Amino acid sequence: GRSYLLDPDNGAVIIHGIQHVRPGESTAHKKAFGTRYGSEAQWSEETGKLLAGNHINYISYGSNRIEVFPAAVRGNLLTPKTQKIAYAENLYLLRTFMWDMSKNLGYAFDDDKYNRLVLLFEPTFATYIDRLVQEKSALFAGDRHFIGFYLDNELPFASYQNADPLRGIDLKHFLSLPERYKAAREYAEKFMRDNGIASTGVITKKNQEDFRGMVADYYYQLTTATVRRY
């Protein structure tokens, strides 16, 4: 069974892990990798021993377009020596929608101008991530080492006192969005109406925090429900 992170005496278990356990993709890395290891099989054998020797109990593969560990390295990394290692992956639901916008919607997202969380409210977002989760969940069905997905590693939530609209969730930023992102703008406008806020000039810190909370709740509720569906 999946007894990777359970203590038989019901004690606390600390996940002692590392992310992105895979060869790099830069030219310099590929050259050094070939010289040092020669093959992925040799690299994974040595890396697996290193993981086991340091009592690692969790790793991730970390591909942007989420995928399982390749067969050539899987055994060496997930069952080094006598140890079983668990893994989980980041679904990158928001980013993948953004990456595929040109193909699906005919235009690219201006990531340097707008907070990517505005894409939550695009009319096709929920349908898109439903298909994506269904596709990716099938990859891990029956995998005894796989313990689940995580969702929030991709989110631009952190910005000190909302100082940077592109790194936080800023109500004024949402209200100023162009017609192309009107779904997110209308979400912010409804928030203003529902809370009796007459103009941007009277938005308080509490209003900002309440709006941040609503957007975060919307993301987590939608994505969690979608993942649990499959």
Language-model features and meaning:
Residues 64, 92-96, 152-156:
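Active-site beta-loop-alpha junctions enriched in small/polar residues
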